[in-house]
């Protein structure tokens, strides 16, 4: 029997516990062909490794068939098959449980108590936008996505640096990246005094212009060898710019902005133990960022104990030699291509139509974000130049298009209701979800609505892990939304949702609409994690 919010993870944990101690043997099915006959499978090979001759004891069958507990989905049947031990859920009960509590499956729950504080540092935002490289743009978009996901889960995030270049602020607005701005630089006087006291410059040494002094970092690197710092780091040339960067990080760590939570006990300098610094950098900035990390440790005895680095891989454009294309040029290219593709589809010059201006702006940003974020951030990214990625099923435009189709569907129901064709939407508790027996309906619920929040929570882990780099999977949301769009598009093209206005058809229509309400909420939450508003038309 299910209690509380159902979860794939909770169900798998209970299934594996029912089999007994040892390695996990169950996995969730995802392919439509397999979901026609089962929802979970314990493969024959895994059972043979666990039990003699692969014969599952009767007590295990009974335990699996009577499975229950917090978050565990209700079981219909469990039976041996040539593939292994096959399990199917009570699907109408799962539909009812999930679709009767949409918010708990589409919106992350905030923790009862505040979790760790995160300082998210993106050095690329100190650049002039006209010189911003594509690899730096990738780091900016990854950082913005991480901020949104962490805050959605109730994590207190402080972003560094505040943007001081008004042109950068304007460019970020075009990209729908939310990042604070500031007009004044942070004072470096106190830090300067501290750092100058640590300089050990010989009289014979001549420093380069603009360099205040040299600090040796070799000892720190050797002490933290296991953490993964570059062993070639020897020293750091300290400049005013470097002090300014360090001062911004110090300010963020020591004087946490108001966020509605009480300050750490012990004053503004307390709480470094619960603070995590995440440096999101391009591959070109990674070496210098390690130096800054070590410099902070050397000159500040109140430096946060955990500094993690996320290094974004290089970005190349097919047909463009080297890395000559800048981020603004890339944005203009994609915007022009979106306008051209829409003009070919709808006819006329819609780019000059004020009603379409915002739509094209959103579509071009969606195209960019899905291109930049659909690949694991650490890997190399190759972008197309002459051909736009707005066509096909793996583009941001495809996702936005299907989100708009959902909006059109519900607008169509509303219009039909106003005309008296359809009754008002009944209470969800009165709906008969046993009428949802199309395989596409279960695919949408089981592969998308049910596991969505679990997937979202796996984007980044703040658990204390060894090493310099933080495990993140910022590609997961984009890939999930693309797959959801493909499943929804297939279902929508095949099934007529708004049927004829006949009373005996309303039950199935409302059950389907409630399912698609859940799909719509998942779409909206997923797009919000990317800073993209849903469109009502394309």
UniProtKB/Swiss-Prot annotation:
One of its GO terms (biological process) is tRNA C3-cytosine methylation. It comes from the Eukaryota. Gene3D superfamilies: Isoleucyl-tRNA Synthetase, Domain 1. InterPro entries: DALR_anticod-bd, DALRD3, tRNAsynth_Ia_anticodon-bd. Disulfide bonds: none annotated. GO terms for molecular function: arginine-tRNA ligase activity; ATP binding; tRNA binding. Coiled coil: none annotated. Part of a complex containing tRNA(Arg) and METTL2. Interacts with tRNA(Arg)(CCU) and tRNA(Arg)(UCU). Interacts with METTL2. Involved in tRNA methylation. Facilitates the recognition and targeting of tRNA(Arg)(CCU) and tRNA(Arg)(UCU) substrates for N(3)-methylcytidine modification by METTL2. This is DALR anticodon-binding domain-containing protein 3. It comes from Rattus norvegicus. The gene is Dalrd3.
């Amino acid at each position: 029997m299910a209690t509380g919010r159902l979860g794939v993870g909770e169900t798998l944990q209970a299934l594996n516990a029912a089999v007994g101690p040892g390695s996990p043997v169950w996995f969730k099915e995802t392919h439509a062909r397999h979901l026609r006959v089962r929802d979970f499978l314990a493969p024959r090979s895994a059972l043979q490794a666990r039990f003699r001759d692969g014969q599952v004891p009767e007590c295990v069958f009974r335990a699996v068939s009577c499975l229950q507990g917090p978050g565990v989905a209700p079981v219909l049947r469990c039976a041996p098959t040539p593939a292994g031990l096959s399990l199917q859920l009570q699907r109408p009960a799962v539909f009812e449980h999930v679709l009767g509590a949409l918010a708990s499956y589409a919106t992350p729950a905030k923790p009862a108590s505040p979790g760790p504080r995160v300082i998210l540092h993106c050095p690329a935002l100190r650049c002039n936008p006209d010189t911003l490289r594509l690899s730096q743009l990738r780091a900016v978009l990854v950082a913005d996505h991480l901020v949104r996901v962490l805050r959605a889960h109730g994590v207190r995030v402080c972003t560094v640096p505040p943007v001081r270049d008004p042109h950068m602020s304007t460019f970020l607005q075009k990209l729908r990246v939310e990042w604070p701005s500031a007009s004044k630089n942070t004072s470096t006087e106190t830090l300067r005094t501290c750092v100058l006291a640590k300089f050990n410059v010989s009289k014979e040494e001549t420093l380069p212009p603009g360099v205040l002094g040299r600090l040796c970092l070799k000892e720190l690197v050797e002490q933290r060898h296991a953490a993964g710092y570059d062993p070639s780091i020897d020293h750091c040339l300290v400049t005013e710019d470097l002090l300014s960067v360090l001062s911004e990080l110090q300010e963020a760590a020591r004087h946490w902005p108001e966020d509605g939570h009480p300050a750490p006990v012990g004053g503004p300098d307390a709480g470094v133990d619960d603070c995590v610094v995440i440096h999101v950098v391009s591959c070109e900035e990674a070496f210098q960022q390690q130096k800054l990390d070590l410099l902070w440790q050397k000159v500040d005895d109140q430096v946060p104990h955990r500094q993690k680095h996320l290094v974004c891989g290089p970005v190349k454009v097919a047909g463009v030699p080297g890395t000559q294309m800048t981020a603004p040029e890339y944005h203009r290219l994609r915007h022009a291509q979106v306008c051209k593709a829409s003009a070919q589809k709808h006819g006329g010059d819609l780019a000059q139509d004020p009603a379409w201006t915002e739509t094209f702006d959103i579509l071009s940003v969606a195209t960019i974000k899905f291109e930049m974020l659909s690949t694991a951030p650490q890997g190399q990214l190759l972008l197309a130049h002459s051909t736009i990625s707005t066509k096909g099923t793996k583009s941001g435009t495809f996702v936005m298009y299907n989100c708009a189709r959902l909006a059109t569907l519900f607008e169509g129901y509303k219009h039909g209701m106003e005309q008296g064709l359809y009754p008002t939407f009944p209470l969800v508790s009165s709906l008969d979800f046993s009428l949802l027996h199309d395989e596409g309906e279960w695919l949408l619920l089981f592969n998308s609505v049910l596991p969505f929040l679990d997937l979202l929570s796996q984007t980044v882990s703040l658990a204390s892990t060894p090493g310099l780099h933080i495990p993140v999977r910022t590609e997961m949301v984009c890939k999930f939304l693309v797959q959801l769009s493909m499943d929804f598009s297939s279902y929508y093209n095949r099934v007529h949702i708004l049927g004829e206005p006949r009373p005996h058809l309303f039950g199935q229509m409302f059950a389907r609409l409630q399912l698609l309400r859940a799909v719509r909420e998942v779409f909206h939450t997923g797009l919000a994690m990317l800073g993209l508003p849903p469109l009502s038309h394309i």
